[in-house]
Structures are given as C-alpha cells and as structure tokens.
C-alpha cells in the first residue's frame, strides 16, 4: 500500500475499504492487480481468494480453468475474445483466471488472475475458499458467487470425490476442488471468474489500467476500488467491460494482454514472452516482437495490452514478451512496475531479477510488465506473475522492490517453508513487509480469516511450515529486515516481501516460487506454478495468498500430484496459465506461470514439462535442467520417481502432497510444471517465460535454471517453476494446463487435464494390473475401469507416474507448445521448424514410440500401459504430439496461425507447437516418444533437454505466441467459445473440423495463435480429456460414448491413443482449426499412426488436407450416419465378432478416408473419439505378443476435441479433457465415431 505508485489509489482503495486490505495485496495486486497475478495472488488475497484464485484458477487447473475457461471463454466471449484470450491464457492459465480473466478478460486476465480476483473472491468467496477441502471444492458456491459462470459440466464430470478432495484440498482452496476438474475448479474458476471478473475487472481495471497503463492503473485502482467494492464483480464487469472495452482494443490486447494476462497471457506474457521468446528476440523481439509477438502475442501483446499495460509496459509486455527478455524489462518493469520509485532500483533489481525474472523474471518482467503496467501487468504481472514466479514473486518479491525481489530469494531458502508456508503461515497481515511467508501468512491469515477452514488446514500446514520456517526463518528474518526496508512496496507488490537474500535474484524467484512453490507450495508451487503461473499472480499472491490457502489448494494439488497440481498449475498455469495465459499466461504464466512457470515454468515447463519434469524448472532452466530433470524425471518414473517422492509410487492421488509435497510434488511438480507449463507454459512460457526463461538466460539460465532449479528444484518444484511446476508437477500432474492443462492445469496448462489425470491418477488404482482388473471386472463400468485402467500395476506405478509425467508433459506440451513456439520460433519456420520439429517430434514420438513400442514389446500389459503412458505422454505429447503431430500439422496450423495471427504468433504458436514438439519432441521425444517411452522408458531428456531448452526457450516464445495464441485462442475460444462450436466439434468430426475451422476461423480471426494455444491447450486438454473421460463420459455429450471412454484398450484411456497420435491429431485439429493447418491438422488428424512394433507410421488421410475435407467429412459424417445404421445392422449380424455390438451400434464409419486397421483375428477396432485404435491381434499380437500393433487413427475429432479443448481447453482442460473425452469420441463425433465398444474379456485377452 505504501508503495508510492499505488499509494493514492491504494488509499482510495483503502477508503473504499474492504478490499482495502485485500487490496493492499490486491493493490499490490493492483499493482499486481494488474498483476493480477500478483494481484491476483495477492489479491488473491483474497488470499483466500487469491489463493483461491490461484487455487481456483490455478487449481482450477486449467482444466477446470480450462473448462472454466470455456466458461471463461464464454465469458470471454462475453468479455471479449480477448477475454477469451485471457481466458485462454487463463485458460491455460487459470483459465480460471483467465476465465476470470476471461471474464474480466482483460481484466483479464490479468487480473484475472489477479483477480483472481480471487482476492475479491476471496473476500466474497472467502467463504467458498474454505471449500478448501475440495469437497466444497466444487464450491459451487464460488461459482454461485460469481453467478456468472456455471460449470455444471464439470460437476457433471464429477471427478472422484477423493480426487476432488485432493484437488479440493489442493484447490482448495478454493473451491478448489476445482482441482477437480469439476465444478470445483470451475468454481474456483468461476469464482475467479467472478472474481476475476471482479478482480479481473479489478485486474482488468488494473489491466486495463494496465493497459491504460498506469492511468488505468489509477483508474484501475479506482475502478479497482470500485471493483473492490463491487466485489469486483461488478467492477469487474463493469470494469471489465470498461476494461475490455477499454482495453479492447488494448483491452483486447489487453485482454490479451490482459491476457497478458495474457500477459499472462500470456503472457502473452508469455507472449510476451513469447516473443520474447522470441525471445528475446524476443526481447527485442520481444519487444518488438515482442510485441509482435507480442503482439501477437499481441495478443499477447495484447499483452500488450498488457501491453497496454504493458504497453505500458508493453512491451513490457511485449516486452514481456520480449521480455522475456523483457524479462528484464519485466524485471524492470517489475521493478518498474513495482513502484515507480522503485523502478530504478527495481530495474536494477530487475536486472538481476531479470534473470531472476527469468526466473521470475519473466514474470517478473512480466510482472514488471504487468507490474509495470502498473498493474498492468500486473496482470501480467500475473504472468509475470507467473513470472510469476518471479513475478510473483518477483513480483512480489521482485517488485518487491528490488529489495523485495531479492528478498524473495531468501525465500528460496524458505521454499520449503513456503512450500509448507504457503499454506498459510500466519504472518502478520499488517506486516506485509514481513517475509512473504509472513505476508503469505498475512494473506493467509486474511484468507484464514476469510477462510477459517482453510486456516485450520493451513494452520496445520502452517505448523509444518512454521517449523520449516523456524528452520528457514532465520534467512527470512534477514529477509524481514530487508523487507522492512522494502516496506510497503513489497507489500504492494504482493506482499511477498521476502527480504532480499543473497543471490536473491534468483532466490527471489525461486524463493517465490519456492515459497510459492513451496512444494507444498508445491502446491503453491503449483499454485505457484500457477502461482507461478499464477505465480505471480499467484505466485506471489498466490504464493502468499495462495500460500495460505491456495497453497493449500495446491497442496492438494500436489497431492494430486501433479495432476492436480498440474492442473492446478495449469490452473496455475492456468493460474499461471491463466496467468500465464492469463499471464498465465499469466497463465502461465500462468503458464506459465507458465511463463512464469514458463519462465519458470518454463522452466518449469520447460521444464518441461518435460522438464517439467524436468522440473525443468528448473530446468528450465530449462532445458538443460529440464532435461536433466527430465532424466531425473525418468528416474522418477523409474521407481525413483516413486521413491523420489516419498509419495507412494502410487498414483498421485495417493500422493501426500503435503509432506512429500516437496519431492513428490517435485516430481509431480515437475510434471506439473510441465503441465503448468503446459498451459501456461505454453504460453506463458512460452513466451516469455520461457523464452525468457529460457530465454536464455533468463530463462534458463538463469532462470531457473538455476534458479529454478537451483533451488527450486530443490524445491524441485520448488523450483519455482516448479514451484510451479513443482507444483507444476503437480500441476502436471497437476497438471497446468492449462490445465494446465494443466495449470492444474490438470494447466494448462493443462491442468485439469492434469488434474484429470491426477484425478485420474488418483482414481487409478495401480495396485492391480489393469488387465487383471479388466479380466476381473470384465466390462466393468468405465469409471471403475478407467480408474484402474490407468495402468498396469507394476509399470503402472512408474508408468502411472510416468503417465502423469506425461501428463505433465502434456502440460508441458502446452508449454511445449509454447516452446514449440520457440522452436518454431525458432524458426518461424515454425512451420518448418515445426515441421521439422514435428518431424522430429514425430520421429521422436515415433522414437518415443519406439521406446514405447519397446515398452510395448515388453508385454501387452505393459504395452498397453505404455501406450497409455504414451498416450498420456502423448497427451502431453499430445500437446507434444500435438505438438508433434500437431506440430507437424500443428506447425502447419501454426503456420496458419502464423498467418493468421501473425506469423509471430503463429510462429510462436508454431513454435509452441514445435516447441512443444521440441519439448515434446524432446519431450515428445521425451514425452512423446521419449516421454512415452520417455515417460516411461527414457525420460531422457534426449533431445528433450536441449530441445526442451530450446523448446523452453521456444516455449517462451511459444508461450508468447501461446499467449498470443492464447489471446487469440481466447478470442478464438470466444469463437470457439462458442461452445456451440465447441460442441459442434464434439458433435461432428466435421464439425469438429469446422470447429477447428471455427477455431481456425476464430483463430484466424483471433489468430491462429489462438489455435496454437488451443493446440497447446489441446495437449493439455487431451490428456485431461482422458481423465475426464471417465467422468466426462457422464456428460451428455459423451453419454453415448461413455462406454467408449471406458474402453480404450486397456491401458489406453480414451486419451490414450497411441502416443499422442490421437492427440496429435487433436492438436492437429486444433491446428487444423487453424487454417490450412486445419487441413494439415486434418491431415494430421487423419494421420494414422500405427503403433506397433517400434515404429509408428503416420499417414495423412487424403482428404485431410483438402479444404473439401471438411465437406467430405460432413458428407462422410452423413454417410457415416447411414453407415452407422448399416453398420449397426451389420454389427448386429456380427455379434459373434463383438459382444458389445450395441456399444458399437453407434460405431460409425471410420473417419473419411481413414480405414480402421483391423489386423488379424481378434483385431479390435475402436474408436476413441474419432480415433481408431486398431489392435491387430494377429498381426502384431500374433507376430509379437509384445507388440500388438495398434493402429491408432487419431482422427480429427481428437483434434477437434482439442479444439474443443481448446475451446474447452479453455474449457480446456477440463473440457479439454472433456473434449478429449470427447475424443472419447468427441461425443458429437458420434456420427463419425461410434462409441467405443467395450472390449470383451475375450477380446482383451486376444488383444
């Protein structure tokens, strides 16, 4: 409050009251607010809410968020595309946030996150917050509070309660169950939404302000205040509108920016980064491009908006993007943003932070950016927040005045504390100046006040944290001293005022992250991630705020393992993502945090995701680290993974996130990160973050790299990124994304996805081999099946984890996508690159596949498992693949995107894709192939590392792009939003295509970027989808396909097409949406991947590339309907072949020009969604028991789903997941795709 910048406004805010406290944070937020992230975080202040937000958003994982996003999107739609974008970002990021963002969109966004409003929410919601448990998680109330969005869908998803609980708890915070994809997340999201809206508005205001830059800020603040009063909501809307409008233009951008949220958006931030990614180029590019990208980012730019804000910052944002490069800028901003007065120092600070930022830098920078924006990025800040991390931290920390930022660092020491601390320590609220922990505590206290329930939990946690704090507090004490110096500004920043500690820059982020991440933080982290992603937002706030609650939430996420977290991440991511995207872009920034994360996240993400895994975060540092982490991860997969985490190897659901959180989170986080990244990353990271993060140093190097890693990793998650990621991991698996998708996602990621995954994971019972289960259960209900389905025991553990990992990756992917961006960006080539990447990825994927195949070779069960894993990876991959295949196509899409968006965006997107690919590739490779195998067999970073790094960098760019994309995406999503479209996608393959097209169109309209984001999201979503499928299957859309979902080949979830293929296609579709890419996507989608033996073959459907393809598809769909009737008759005649004819009655003709591959006797064909799995019993089975060949034909539908996701992705992850679920057949694809038939035991055996 004291900070000069805000003081007046703040005063007014104070006067305004009630939010005042929040506002302080909020203000910070405000600053934040814009930051949102921070703000958000702080704001979240609402700790509660904020936390909530985080959690919500974050937690919400992306999925939720995403899903929410959809809502968001819708909201966005309402709000603006930008909002959407924000959403996207948010989506990714928070989705929630975004959503909120969305809602606010602009506000985004930013605020979204920030909003997250949360804070407000928190106020409003504090009650909800208590939902902390997760039971409440659904916290529909939150939703109610928002009253805007309804997430019934999620509810319909109805994740398993425990999952939910976990999530919830994690989420918890927020509604958090949000973590559950279900409503909770939604709720959170919703809340966020509202909040966001509110906040957003707030933020938005901020954002807008941001956009408007400071003025707005002031206004913002004012508005903000109003908002505050409004609770945001009004404001938000109000503001929102205003903002949007306001921004719009910028707003849009803003939104986007807001996104900047997007800055978040993605950071746009990311984008911002992304460009940034561009990285630096972004930097310059960043800025410039950054803007451009940014712009596209612009969206990001919109970021810009942030830009505006940024634009103020702008560029900052963009810068951010660039920033990434910006990083510094951000940092600068960061500092800059922080308080004007502080600026200079801050800048310096920044500089250090730059790296820092990188760590958080991005964020920071983002933050800065945002921050700068005054808020404005604030929102971004969010992102930055993600920058979060840094931002968030950075933010808080960073901004924290330089001191603060530095202060953060010590936090890094505190990470463990924060991890635990994030759960509310009860610092003196009054003294925000005190350590973040204290602040967090303060916030947490507020939250606690607001959320006694949470407090209880948190208190418990706090006790732990306090213990840790006691251990670590000394440094914090030092920090306190410094912080005191910082005084208000830190507070303003987000209150996380950790005193600067030596090395604080890094520490700062890290600390932040850590703290955010805190593993527990982890959750936080996640949150962070989210937070981070949100990170900033969240992070910071989240952190703090979150910490308390959110953290808690995260915490659960952690439990979620990453899934949840990841999602959360996504959420975070989303959160961040949101932020990242949101800035999540915030999201990321959320995504990353992403960015944040990304940045960190990226790190994270880049960490992957993979890194994410990598911890990447550290890695994120990517890349390398990432890779190492990746490897590390691998180890995780190996038992080490399990062992690594104290967490039982059991699926995350068992994961204790808390105590273990750190490590498991770590792993999870890692994942999460990824996921986070995913979403966020993706975009967050992507851009900026990444880039930034990666960005080289910033990124990586610094970023986290060390930093991240450094500590973080220690935190591993901690890594800030991880933190986010860590959480991220969580997130990732959390998942996200977006989702992530996570953040968590299960974002976002990616997030829900992750979440879902997590959930799923949670749901999954590794104890018994699936097959056994299947045998025993026979055609047991899908839910049950799926729960178990996941994996076969032995491997399942590792696999499971792996799966999660992959999941993360998925998030990652998102991130990756972002990364791709990079890569692509790395070339803009993108396309080329992408393609190359894709190819590589594909190759990698294939390689991975090979690995996978090898795994497959080991035994069917294994095979299945692996495949599943792969799929998951693919999922992740999906993103990756998406990226991969997608990349290929996706790239194309990207290309399209590029075309549409800008090339930049597209590039970014492409890059993202590629990046993802890279990541994925690497990841994929790692994740995909690698992941697949990677996930399983080698987690070696393989190219993943480098790629990952690249990816990461790219990712950052990607993120930027992504952000942009996200922005675009949001826009697209708005279009998409049109869930109708979305649904349409569901509804028909063609539709889907169309949908994509819509997307495309939207993308086109919005930018392909959006699509890209979608893609990114897709990745997240995809996985998620799987998870959700289980739940989703219930959803009406999926009803027909329930069984389908139910039955992927064992070990395959619907999601689990051969690795990523389906996903790829999905992505492709997304891409597809994107334009030609659509075609490509279609092609990709069409591509038939055969998994068998070591290699996958992909073929393009003839029609996939034709524009007429869709028409053909439509015709085919019609035909397929007829065929279905015929087939139904025939099938009835063929009962002998299939016991489950009824289930297949709906089985429609294969997608156009695609023929299922049935091989040999017993060959089973299944549509998962439109995907066809062919199992050639005789062919591969006979030939090699171990290598049944799977012909997976990812059909566009998946892509569609992705799109859907994307859409949903906004929905994203949730929906994504759901959509994936859709994939499940894209329920709407029913015509095209019959429900999957259940395998009979016999078949299974044969199979």
Swiss-Prot record:
Region (Disordered): 25-141, 169-431, 472-667, 738-770, 807-857, 869-1087, 1099-1122, 1139-1162
Ranges of compositional bias, category Basic residues: 984-995
Transmembrane segments: none
Biased composition annotated in UniProt, kind: Pro residues: 1047-1060
GO cellular component terms listed in the entry, alphabetical order: mediator complex
GO biological process: positive regulation of transcription by RNA polymerase II
Residue ranges with Polar residues bias: 126-139, 342-356, 511-522, 929-942, 1026-1044, 1099-1108
Highest taxon of the lineage: Eukaryota
Biased amino acid composition, Low complexity: 26-125, 169-178, 185-223, 230-341, 363-375, 385-394, 409-431, 472-484, 523-544, 553-628, 655-667, 738-759, 807-855, 871-928, 943-983, 996-1021, 1064-1087, 1110-1122
GO molecular function per UniProt: transcription coactivator activity
Protein name in UniProt: Uncharacterized protein DDB_G0283357
